[in-house]
Structure formats: C-alpha cells, structure tokens
Amino acid sequence: RDPEMSRGLGDVYKRQIQYFGDNLRPYWNREGNETIVSQFQKAEKEYKTQMKNSAAFDKKLMEEATAAGGRKYAELCALAYRQALAAHKLVQAPNGDLVFLSKENFSNGSIGTVDLTYPGAPLLLYYNPELVKATMNHIFYYSESGKWAKPFAAHDVGTYPLANGQTYGGDMPVEESGNMVVLAAAIAKVEGNADYAQKHWETLTTWTDYLVENGLDPANQLCTDDFAGHFAHNANLSIKAIMGVASYGYLADMLGKKDVAEKYTQKAK
C-alpha cells in the first residue's frame, strides 16, 4: 500500500488520538469545523505562497547549517529535519495544552516516548520551543494527575493511537527522568526564563531526587538502547543522571532558589 496515501487518510478521521479517555481531533481541526476537503482547497489557494516560504526556509536552513559545520553537515541536518518531525501527531489536550505525540514505528508502537523526544529536541528548541513543551506535556500530566505514581518519569503514555497510559513493560527510570529534567533546563536556556520548569517544579524535584539516590551507579535498568536489555553500572545512565541533577540546579538558580541551586549543583559535581 502507498504509505503517503495511508498518512493522508489518517488525517481524514475526525478523532485520531485517544488521550486518557478523551478522543481528540487533529490540531488542524481542533474546533471540529474543518474538513479535509477544506484543507485541500486552502492548500491549493496558498500553494504558490507556501512553496515560496518553503524554498526560503530550505535555503536558510542549508546556509546556517553549512556555516556551522560545512556542506556534509548541512546535508545531514536536512535529513534530520524530516526524520525528527516524522511520525508525530499534534493535538490539543482538554486542559488546553499542546501535545505533540511521537509514534515508535519499528519497535512496539509506543506513543509519546520520552527517549524519542530527547534526541529530536535540538531541532524543536532551535525552531519552536513550544513544540518541545508539547512533547513533554503528556508526561508531566501523567504524573501530576496521579495516573502515574512512580517517583520517576514514565517511558511513554500508551500504544499509538491510544495514549491512555504506559503499555511498555520496561521502565527506564534514570533515562527518562534525566531526559525530562535536562529538556526543562534546555527550554529555560533558550527562552531566558524558567517559567515552564516552575509550573512543574514539584514533579521535577521528585524526579531529580530519584536521580540523586539512584543515578550515580545505576542498578539493573533499561536505557534508550533497550534492545541490549537490562544491565547495571551503565556509565551512560550515570552521566545522564549527573546532567539531570546539574540541570535542576541550573533551573533552581534561574528561579532564585539559591540554596537549592547550590545544593544540587554540588551533588552533580
């Protein structure tokens, strides 16, 4: 079957994602007053303008990437742009949050996986930090709603297209907690404020304390390379935990919590 046709048909359905029991429309039809036909008509009407905008964006991306690392690096960035954005669905949660959900295509179909969010984040941080938040909002909600009661970040929120709670059998406590705290700090760095972290401070504190207690010499845990299985004393996880604790200290400093910042920065060191 034609994958492009399948992708197009996916956007015809009125409610594509089930999010903790609520069936959500795609973002382009979040109010329920659009049709795929109206979108095709809009695309036809705006075709020349959007193609011009696309060409200008492509040119800018290649120029900036070439300046940063040369032509071969720029070509990798062009590939990475598509790769990082593929297999995501943008919806609006009932509480108004943007939610940008990934799908694992060649493993188990998990939706909203944190260790997929993390490596794709640099692209979104550069072009649209609000989309980084949108890749994190569902994980924060999962914990803060009480639906996920463990003291570390969840791995995912279900199996696409059902985002009703983690279905993957193996937690990644240090991996995902570290990822979430580091990403919160990256958002603060880019935006020049820690407002997003402040909104989720209690949850970030819980996850960071888990990293302090369990991250330096991790026990038998999975990491993002889960095909390797569980193993202890994972140096990569240890580094992830250290960076997570340091990131929390950085956020605390931005929020004026000087004693907290000093405490956690020293723990990271």
Describe every region a protein language model picked out:
Residues 222-229:
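Short linear capping/connector segments at secondary-structure termini
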Residues 1, 20-51, 109-218, 234-252:
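Aromatic-rich carbohydrate-recognition surfaces in CAZymes
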Residues 3-9, 13:
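Single conserved hydrophobic/aromatic residue that forms the stacking wall/gate
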Residues 252-269:
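Carbohydrate-active enzyme catalytic cores, enriched for enzymes
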Residues 37-108, 130-141, 147-149:
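Low-complexity, Ser/Thr/Pro/Gly-enriched N-terminal "stalk/linker" regions
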Residues 15-18:
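Short glycine/proline/serine/threonine-rich loop/turn segments at secondary-structure transition edges
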Residues 97, 196, 233, 260:
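Conserved acidic
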